[in-house]
Amino acid sequence: SQPLSDPAVLKNLTSTITTILAVERLDYTKGIPERLQAFAAFLQRYPQYLERIQLYQIACPSRLDIQTYQQLRQQVHTLVEQINSQFATASWQPIIYQEDPVSHDNLMPLFRQCQICWVNSLKDGMNLVAKEYIAAQDEQNAGILILSKNAGAAHQLQQAILVDPTNNDSMIEGLYQALTMTKQ
């Protein structure tokens, strides 16, 4: 399949599906398995969002020579497969997963195109993805940032919906809040 950042793919993002973007290194500090589990629990709790939302998870592998990172990669692949097989329909799958890195030039249009960005760091410094997502937004059609309270940027980005990346209910309700704020 084509990378999410491909301009042809960007044009195909339809207004009928709310797109949620998550982009980071495949690293245990980024809270990827926790986000995926919360996303599955969200779909279970709010089935009215089936076929109405899609998570674009971009996870660039790093340190794959280290066994714990290999195990994390396998865990993420397994979760994506399980969630997609549980909830997918003939015309929709809940998670699009990509490991190909995205260039900065392609990331900016992707930030503008996706209605929600979800940064779920378990522990993080400033987290530039959160700041870049906010900076890339068009004032007339700004996206919504779901941000881990453990990201350093959480203290500066007051407009973000803050979530606890270790608490499923916090993430589920943060996503619900973001979705009810987006223009449907």
Predicted regions and their residues:
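Nucleotide-sugar donor-binding and catalytic loop/hinge architecture
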Residues: 2-20, 47-50
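Conserved donor-binding/catalytic core segment of Leloir-type glycosyltransferases
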Residues: 13-29, 36, 55-56
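Short hydrophobic signal-anchor/transmembrane segments that target glycosyltransferases
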Residues: 32-49
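A conserved amphipathic alpha-helix that caps or lines the catalytic cleft of carbohydrate-
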Residues: 39-43, 80, 134
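Catalytic binding pocket for nucleotide-activated donors in carbohydrate/polymer assembly enzymes
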Residues: 44-56, 112, 116-184
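Nucleotide-activated donor-binding/catalytic signature segment of Leloir-type glycosyltransferases, i.e.
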Residues: 59-105
